[in-house]
């Protein structure tokens, strides 16, 4: 029986620097309101960033975004949240 490897996680190259930062915060478990406060932006702007991240990476939800962030090494377990 042949085992096919899973395709690699989507490249993060499609994301802007700001979107990458938002993805980092999503992976750390922050809500839209918390991300907005941390980045000093409107909550609606955060929602827009989240939507763009999901669309660019062809993800269904935030949970998948968290998985991608860890699988690509964008965040690592136990790392500081700063």
How should these model regions be labeled?
Residues 3-25, 76-82:
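Regulatory hinge/linker segments at domain boundaries
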Residues 9-12, 28, 56, 72:
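ABC ATPase NBD switch/coupling site
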Residues 13, 24, 37-41, 59, ...:
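Positively charged, aromatic-enriched patches within helix-turn-helix-type DNA-binding elements
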Residues 23-27, 54, 66:
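Hydrophobic residues on short alpha-helical segments
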Residues 25-27, 44, 70:
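Short amphipathic helical patch at the helix-1/turn junction of helix-turn-helix
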Residues 31-64:
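Recognition helix of helix-turn-helix DNA-binding domains
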Residues 55-82:
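Basic, Lys/Arg-enriched C-terminal extension of HTH/homeodomain DNA-binding domains
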């Amino acid at each position: 029986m042949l085992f096919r490897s899973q395709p690699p996680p989507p490249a993060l190259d499609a994301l802007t620097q700001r979107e990458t930062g938002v993805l980092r915060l999503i992976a750390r478990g922050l809500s839209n309101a918390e991300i907005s406060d941390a980045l000093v932006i409107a909550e609606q702007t955060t929602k827009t960033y989240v939507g763009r991240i999901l669309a660019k990476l062809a993800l269904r939800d935030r949970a998948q975004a968290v998985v991608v962030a860890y699988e690509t090494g964008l965040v690592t377990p136990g790392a500081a949240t700063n």
